[in-house]
């Protein structure tokens, strides 16, 4: 016998989206609520038995009422049992939405740091979980746990951190996972899907977040789904994000920034959020970022441009001129040659551009 599950985590509902305009941020929050409905439809259309939500559904303890209502409605519409393990951003407390909201009957919220077992005899399955009850959890919630040796399929949902033993966010170890006797461990906290891993008989994974919220959450985001049986889990990653965050480096050496950017862009970007970093060499005028942004902004949901170019060698060659320009360039080139970092060299190049523009009576 097997059960079909969906594993998701780290929704961070009602995030601020501070890098976007106020209207774009409002739209992204609306889309985050719409994500819940899309997830509910996916669960029902694909015959899912169990939904495991591994914490940080909320970004903070300040959540819009319409978001709570949308979440409750979406989860209640799922023709599946739903299990939630609160995380460090949304710990369980008497004042948290997990305690104050009237949740649908098919939703179970784990409320204690002690692992709880919920039996589902009709599925021959047991679901285990535990909760953050404060923003930090110094000790592993999995320490000392082992599932009984019975005929049930054993699933667990936790918010925790395997990456560092000194973590303050439920520091899990591979040894604890191996000794747990769990068939599938659904984890939250890390926002990047890192593949399916195995310790002993336990398959475990981080689903990552279903939608990126910033340039530290790049690329495709989604959920995990598949089947679990005794000692075996077969799941796959399902892309679910409406928009992606991407960072693109564009070398402008020997060509205009506009042509270089056109050549580097993929076909479809209008739904996505991009940071373009221009690199390489330019002439003394540098880049007109405002003009580039005006030209390309309609091709994106949001566009951010960064100039990390440097003055070309042909400009520095003019340091040999017997003029004020030459003297200025010689002074800066001396500093440029002994600079200890790319960031310092970039600042010197920028100073050279502004200085040359001032000498020529031009604006940048």
Which residue stretches match the model-derived regions?
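N-terminal active-site segment of His-dependent metallophosphoesterases
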Residues: 1-70, 347, 353-356, 360-364
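Acidic/glycine-enriched edge-of-secondary-structure segments
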Residues: 20-31, 126-131, 242-255
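Glycine-rich phosphate-binding loop signature in dinucleotide/nucleotide-binding domains
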Residues: 43-47, 121, 149-150, 267-269
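Short loop/turn motifs at secondary-structure junctions
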Residues: 47-48, 124, 181, 270-272, ...
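His/Asp/Glu-rich metal-coordinating catalytic cores
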Residues: 50, 59-205, 209-220
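Accessory, non-catalytic peripheral segments of nucleic-acid enzymes
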Residues: 230-364
């Amino acid at each position: 016998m097997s059960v079909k599950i969906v594993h998701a985590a780290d929704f961070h509902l009602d995030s601020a989206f501070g890098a976007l305009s106020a209207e774009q941020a409002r739209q992204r929050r609306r889309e985050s609520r719409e994500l819940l409905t899309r997830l509910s439809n996916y669960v029902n259309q694909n015959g899912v038995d169990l939904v495991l939500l591994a914490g940080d559904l909320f970004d903070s303890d300040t959540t819009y009422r319409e978001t709570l209502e949308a979440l409750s409605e979406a989860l209640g519409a799922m023709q599946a049992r739903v299990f939630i393990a609160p995380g460090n951003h949304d710990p369980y407390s008497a004042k948290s939405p997990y305690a104050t909201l009237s949740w649908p009957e098919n939703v179970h919220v784990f409320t204690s740091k002690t692992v709880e077992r919920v039996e589902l005899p009709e599925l021959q399955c047991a679901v285990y979980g535990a909760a953050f009850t404060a923003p930090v959890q110094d000790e592993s919630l999995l320490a000392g746990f082992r599932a009984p040796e019975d005929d049930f399929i054993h699933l667990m949902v936790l918010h925790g951190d395997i990456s560092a033993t000194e973590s303050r966010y439920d520091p899990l170890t591979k040894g604890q996972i191996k000794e747990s006797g769990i068939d599938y461990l659904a984890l939250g906290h890390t926002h990047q899907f890192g593949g399916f891993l195995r310790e002993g008989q336990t398959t475990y994974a981080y689903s990552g977040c279903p939608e990126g919220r910033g340039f530290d959450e790049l690329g495709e985001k989604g959920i995990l789904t598949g089947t679990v049986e005794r000692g075996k889990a077969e799941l796959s990653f399902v892309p679910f994000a409406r928009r992606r965050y991407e960072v693109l480096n564009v070398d402008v050496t020997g060509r205009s920034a506009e042509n270089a950017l056109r050549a580097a862009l993929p076909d479809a970007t209008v739904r996505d959020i991009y940071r373009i970093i221009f690199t390489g060499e330019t002439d003394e005028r540098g880049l007109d970022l405002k003009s580039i942004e005006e030209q390309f902004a309609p091709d994106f949901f949001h566009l951010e441009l960064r100039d990390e170019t440097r003055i070309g060698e042909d400009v520095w060659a003019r340091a040999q001129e017997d003029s004020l320009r030459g003297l200025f360039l010689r002074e800066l080139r001396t500093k440029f040659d002994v600079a200890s970092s790319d960031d310092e060299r970039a600042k010197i190049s920028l100073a050279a551009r502004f200085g040359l523009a001032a000498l020529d009576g031009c604006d940048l």
